[in-house]
């Protein structure tokens, strides 16, 4: 476990190849205690968070098991990481902590997509911000029209952000 709470495992290669990071995140969008089990129907598994990103953790372990059981040798080291704080206000915190502490990674693969036929190469980055709007506020009935409402300023800001043109 590293300083960011990530679970890290290293499978050594011969030292003659790139150092590869393969990661999936531990957290889900569901609050703790939401998952009470996994249900199987028609050969499929169902549970909150199973596609984002519990499946990736199973894939990390499955890949490691397959490499070891088949005695597959790699040239480069493979670092397996189950990262923290990907969802919501986590802002990819676990991954950022890991990369800040490990600047020797040559290639990074992230498993985080329900459609395994899709491979995304060089995706854009993201930033997470917390913005607070303060004001006097007031009851909608008793103070209607008498003072600025912070919620109105927040709504205007969100509307302007939604109008941004994202580079392609």
Q: Where do the model's predicted regions map?
A:
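Acidic/His- and Gly-rich active-site-bordering loop/insert found
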Residues: 1-48
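Acidic-enriched catalytic cores of C-N bond-cleaving enzymes acting on peptides and small amides
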Residues: 121, 143-168
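Short glycine-enriched loops at secondary-structure junctions
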Residues: 24-29, 35, 114-116, 123-127
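Acidic/histidine-rich catalytic neighborhood of metal-dependent amide-processing enzymes
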Residues: 49-124
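Fold-independent oxyanion-binding glycine-rich loops
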Residues: 1-4, 24-26, 50, 83-86, ...
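Short glycine-aspartate micro-motif
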Residues: 19-21, 106-110, 130
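Generic secondary-structure signature for well-ordered alpha-helical cores
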Residues: 69-73, 100, 104, 132, ...
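A short glycine/serine-rich beta->alpha loop
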Residues: 42-51, 138-143
């Amino acid at each position: 476990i590293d300083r960011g709470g990530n679970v890290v495992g290293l499978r050594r290669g011969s030292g003659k190849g790139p150092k590869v990071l393969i990661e999936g995140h531990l957290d889900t969008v569901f609050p703790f205690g939401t998952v009470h089990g996994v249900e199987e129907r028609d050969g499929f598994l169902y549970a909150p968070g199973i596609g984002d990103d519990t499946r990736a953790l199973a894939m990390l372990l499955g890949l490691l098991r397959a490499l070891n059981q088949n005695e597959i040798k790699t040239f480069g080291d493979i670092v397996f990481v189950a990262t923290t704080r990907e969802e919501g206000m986590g802002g990819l915190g676990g991954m950022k902590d890991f990369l800040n502490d490990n600047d020797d990674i040559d290639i990074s693969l992230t498993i985080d997509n329900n459609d395994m036929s899709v491979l995304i190469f060089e995706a854009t980055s993201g930033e997470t911000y917390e913005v607070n709007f303060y004001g006097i506020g007031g009851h909608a009935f008793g103070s209607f029209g008498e003072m600025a409402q912070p919620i109105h300023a927040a709504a205007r800001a969100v509307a302007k952000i939604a109008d941004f043109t994202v580079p392609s």
